[in-house]
Amino acid sequence: MNDIILTSQKLYKSYHDGTSTVEVLKGVDLAITKGDRIAIIGPSGSGKSTLLHLLGGLDKPTSGLITLGNVNWQKINEKQRCQLRNQQLGFVYQFHHLLPEFTALENVMMPLLLAGMAVKDAEEKAINMLEHVGLKPRLAHKPAQLSGGERQRVAIARALVHQPHCVLADEPTGNLDEATASKVFDLMLELNKKMNTALVIVTHDQRIAERMDRVLVLHEGSLYARE
């Protein structure tokens, strides 16, 4: 059985500023399998977030191939990309990106409702997921009524509620104090193990990187395993 869920092959990404071309990624190859724990590290501005956006179908490469399951990102239209993202990927960012006018429960229900799930079923799954992250008593609270760590836990619940094959996380603990960051990261690893969801984290935090199964370095456009 093939457990590879997300791949990039010979991935290039360039930006033009009007007078010159900046090559950010130069032939990046990556294979992500079920349950993987991967940290991507590298200097600021090296293209780590760009790589994550490309893997998630949020941006298009200059050239190369990105495959999610058996689907080539470049061969489908934007509507199909949105549907595939919502079915198979979860995203967690440094800023939680919760919708401020909605409660924690409503924020976590959102991806399920967008996928066409009935409200009652979506509510049941969202409550269960918020219970998993220790927030069942905070279901009716809006983001402004939650602490930074609680908001990030809601964001994690939202990313995992539809049981994605892979979660792409960009500095998910970057805005949190050390103690809260450690608790949030522990939670991500626990859910990764329990749900067998691949976890790919872009981070500057060496303590986080050390706890992942694979540490990849992005430097001068190339991605390689840290020795």
UniProtKB/Swiss-Prot annotation:
What GO annotations for molecular function exist for this entry? Answer: ATP binding; ATP hydrolysis activity; transmembrane transporter activity
Q: Which PROSITE patterns match?
A: ABC_TRANSPORTER_1 (PS00211), ABC_TRANSPORTER_2 (PS50893), LOLD (PS51244)
UniProt-listed Pfam families = ABC_tran
Show the SMART domains listed in the entry. AAA
Q: How does it sit in the membrane?
A: Peripheral membrane protein
Enzyme class name: translocase
The answer to whether keyword ATP-binding applies is yes
Choose one Gene Ontology CC annotation of this protein and give it: plasma membrane
Q: Report the residue ranges that make up the ABC transporter domain in this protein.
A: 6-227
Q: Where in the cell is it found?
A: Cell inner membrane
Q: Which residues bind ATP?
A: 42-49
Task: Specify whether Nucleotide-binding is a keyword of the entry.
Answer: yes
Assembly behavior: The complex is composed of two ATP-binding proteins (LolD) and two transmembrane proteins (LolC and LolE).
Task of the protein: Part of the ABC transporter complex LolCDE involved in the translocation of mature outer membrane-directed lipoproteins, from the inner membrane to the periplasmic chaperone, LolA. Responsible for the formation of the LolA-lipoprotein complex in an ATP-dependent manner.
User: Belongs to which family?
Assistant: Belongs to the ABC transporter superfamily. Lipoprotein translocase (TC 3.A.1.125) family.
Name listed for the protein in its UniProt record: Lipoprotein-releasing system ATP-binding protein LolD
Q: Which organism is it from?
A: Legionella pneumophila subsp. pneumophila (strain Philadelphia 1 / ATCC 33152 / DSM 7513)
| Gene field | lolD
